Structure formats: structure tokens, C-alpha cells
Amino acid sequence: GQTVEVAVGGAAPPTAVIVAMEQMGFRVTHLYGLTESYGPATYCAPQPGWANLGLEDKALEMARQGVRYPTLFDQAVLNPETMTPVPADGETIGELMLRGNTVMRGYLKNPDATDEAFSGGWFHTGDLGVVHGDGYVEIKDRSKDIILSGGENISSLEVEEALYRHPKVMEAAVVAKLDDKWGETPCAFVTLTPDAENVSAEDIIQWCRDNLAHFKAPREVVFGPLPKTSTGKIQKFILREQAKELPKNS
């Protein structure tokens, strides 16, 4: 059959979504950008060696944000405290920063926000990520979405990735929920597939415990539709407010 080239963006595509699209005949290219960067800032340029990988491993490569888009002057993952590049080890987290003529000049009539955004001469995206050995960037989370639990940083995207691999999960989003003992713990909001029957919160939590370090598994699961923007992006700020209304873990 014919292969259809598709660009995806708005939010990082879970590997399960990429696998499903590839199986349907779509060749996926992942684009990343912000309003402030006037569209794509990075793209996950496919590499010839990926063709030899299994579909799951290939999807893991394709889900990364990738390399600098040709119209962008420069990108880097920097330590925001020292403004020095993080090592390309796939583990050390820094903030993705951009600069170039396609990046905005500033926020209208808001010089304080502009100065903060361009501290150190780079535009601070607010996205935390790593650089892999091949130079490809992978975003781990928005800085405001990182869950601080018992002194450990938990990436909400990593937990969501595990949830999307569950065969009965159609959509998922994870936010922090206050916890008397740990400070914060992951709270998962999940939309099940139409054919899902008798899937409980305990089933979802156990799935995560089987696929993640135990401390990263959600302690609470809320089922139902997820709030979205007109373009289909999940509105996590609404979910954070909903999580605040839930009884606090103790």
C-alpha cells in the first residue's frame, strides 16, 4: 500500500500512537515548537539505521524531539543555573533553549516576562530534557509538570508513556497530587477504550508498577473524558485543579 507522510506536534506522541500510525501506513515525523518560536524549532529527522529496528524500538527513536529545525539558528539543552550544556548522556536533565531570527523578540508590553524568558541570552522554553549520544533531544517534561515525590523527580510524560501502552487506555494525562508523606505523588486521569470492561484503578496502578519503578506509579486514577483545547491538546492546568479537589493522600 501507499505510505502517507504525516507530521505530528502539539504534544509529544506516545510510542503506542506512533506504532499504531505506522501499522496503518503512515510515516510519522515529530515536530516540536512554540508560539514564541514561530512554528517548528526541532524535528525528529529519521536516520537510515532506524529501518533495521523493530517497530517498538523505532517508535522510541521517533518519539524524541530530535535536532534543530533548519530555520532555527541554534538550540541547546543547558543547565539553567550555569547556562552550560548538559552532557549528551541521555540522562542529565537541563532546559531546552533556543535562539535565532525565528524566535520572538519579546512579550508585548511585558518587559519583565521578556527579561525572564531571555535570561542568559537564550529563550527559555520551560521544557526539561536530555541530549542523547546521537545529538537528538528528548523532552522529559514541562518544568511545571515535574512531580516532586520524596526527593525524587518523576516525569509525568514517562508515566503517561507507560499508561498509553495499556491495551485498554485510549488517552491519559498525569499531574501531581499533594501527599502528606511524599509531598506529591502522580495522579492519572484516564479515558478507556470503548471496548474496555471491568478495568479498575487498581488494574491501572498495577500495570504502571509492572512497567515503571514502583515510586513512579500513580497512587490514584480518575476515569473519564479529558479536557482539551480546540486543537485537541490536553489541558493539564484543569486537571491540576481537579486533583486539588480530590482527598489528599496521607
Sequence positions of predicted segments:
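Hydrophobic/anchoring residues in structured secondary elements
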Residues: 8, 174, 220-223, 239
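Residue-level recognition of the N-termini of beta-strands and the immediately preceding loop/turn
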Residues: 1-5, 218-220
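Acidic/polar alpha-helix N-cap and adjacent early helical turns
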Residues: 242-250
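AMP-binding/adenylate-forming catalytic core of the ANL superfamily
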Residues: 100, 105-106, 128-215, 227, ...
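Conserved AMP-binding/adenylate-forming
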Residues: 4-9, 13-31, 35-136, 143-146, ...
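Conserved Rossmann-like nucleotide-binding pocket used by diverse enzymes
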Residues: 7, 124, 155, 222, ...
